[in-house]
A protein has these predicted regions:
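Catalytic, metal-anchored helix/loop core of enzyme active sites in primary metabolism
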Residues: 1-424
Length: 424
């Protein structure tokens, strides 16, 4: 495991552009501040002003009032929106909140605004952007020598070789609950002593159903997750277990563990977030109630822990934690993701982009639930075996994504004109 991206035994020191001095709070840039990860990160910052200060925020641009409120409360220097047409509304919202004589933050707008912020002087960049558009900011933060608290799994998945080429040991701190758990459990032994990683899955709302029973699932049913509160795309990904497939690819890249040494088990209570089995037969697990503030706080504060980031397990109450093997026939997304990850190159980008389009088609009534992964598999098969290695470029990733999105839309539209279980 010499090629790991995430090193819990190593501490990365940010580049000289870090403005923090002795005794000063750690400076942060939060990308995706109005989303689920971003809002919870801000909650942690506001409760720990002696530990953290936010210098810049970015968001897509659909919630300018909330972004302006965050900027005012945190007194940031810069605010960015990806949508240039949202800039006037953001400036107006900022003007409403700042009093006479108060200096307003600088406003950046456009598709490259978050990337510019990611390279700005700070200690840690939290990438909480959703989707592969987070790749460019991820690369910018790493190249600028920032610590990267990575919640944007897609940037690592679609651009794995690109990220590995620029990241330095200990520079990436994973924020996904499963990878944060693995990161913590890996401190219990040497990398050569690791036998396998065990990634847990809640099983989503349809655990125990057969493939035939899943065919008639509606969007409303799929959006009702039993454990986590998430956005619609991530919630559907959890229901199909595509999210777990993406996490397996992410674990492979972060910890340099082969796919045949990564196992997925279903754990409905979501208290054990992942485990590491060592060569002596012992298994170390990280346990906490399902609350994303815990891994977010660890990502912001590593190697220190933030006191009272979230409630711990209540050991005074009787409770049962269950574990079940994964039903790969009903949920083929995990083995498909392992296949895609083994192909490497642009295949993960094709997998991710096609899935996003198929989820959109399902939510709009154009695909059956089981058609999401079936269609993604068809797109991956058509893509074939991609070019591998360090020659991968951002342009290659974007081109593959564009093709995959178009092809997925074509196949989804064809499926909508045929019986629900028909496939191209």
């Amino acid at each position: 495991m010499t090629d790991s991206l995430a090193h819990p035994h190593l501490r990365f020191e940010p580049a000289a552009g870090d403005p923090d001095g002795p005794g000063r709070p750690r400076s942060l840039v939060i990308l995706g501040s109005t989303g689920s990860i971003g809002t919870q990160a801000i909650d942690i910052v506001l409760r720990n002003p002696d530990r953290f200060r936010v210098t810049a925020l970015s968001a897509a641009g659909g919630r300018t009032e909330l972004l302006a409120e965050q900027a005012h409360r945190l007194r940031v220097d810069t605010v960015a929106v990806a949508r240039a047409d949202a800039a006037p509304a953001l400036r107006a919202a900022l003007a409403d909140r700042y009093g006479p004589g108060e200096k307003l933050p600088e406003v950046l707008a456009g598709p490259d605004a978050a990337t510019e912020l990611a390279a700005s002087p700070c200690h840690t960049v939290l990438n909480g952007i959703t989707g592969s558009i987070g790749l460019a900011p991820t690369l910018a933060a790493l190249k600028a020598g920032r610590v990267l608290a990575l919640a944007n799994k897609e940037s690592l998945i679609v651009g794995g070789p690109l990220v590995k080429a620029v990241a330095r040991p200990g520079q990436i701190i994973p924020v996904d609950s499963e990878h944060s758990a693995l990161f913590q459990a890996l401190t219990g032994g040497d990398r050569a002593e690791v036998r396998k990683l065990v990634v847990t899955a809640s099983g989503g709302p349809f655990r125990g159903r057969t493939r035939d029973e899943l065919a008639g699932v509606t969007p409303e049913q799929a959006l009702a997750h039993p454990t986590w509160s998430m956005g619609p795309v991530v919630t559907i990904n959890s229901a199909t277990l595509v999210n777990k497939g993406l996490e397996v690819i992410e674990a492979h890249l972060l910890f340099d563990v082969p796919f045949d040494a990564i196992e997925v088990v279903v754990h409905p209570q979501s208290f054990i977030h992942s485990m590491v089995e060592f060569t002596d037969g012992s298994t170390l697990a990280q346990a906490s109630p399902p609350d994303m503030r815990m891994p977010i706080a660890l990502g912001l504060g590593w190697p220190d822990r933030v006191p009272d980031a979230a409630p711990g397990v209540d050991w005074t109450t009787a409770q049962s934690w269950e574990f079940f093997p994964l039903d790969a026939e009903a949920f083929p997304s995990v083995p498909l993701a392992c296949h895609v990850g083994s192909l490497g190159g642009t295949a993960p980008a094709v997998f991710n982009a096609a899935n996003e389009e198929c989820v959109d088609a399902f939510l709009k009534g154009g695909l059956p639930f089981t058609g999401i992964v079936d269609t993604v598999a068809d797109v991956v098969a058509e893509h074939g075996t991609p070019a591998r290695g360090t020659s991968l470029t951002v342009a290659d990733v974007l081109e593959a994504e564009t093709w995959a999105r178009a092809r997925a839309r074509e196949l989804a539209a064809r499926a909508a004109r045929t019986p629900s279980e028909a496939r191209a």
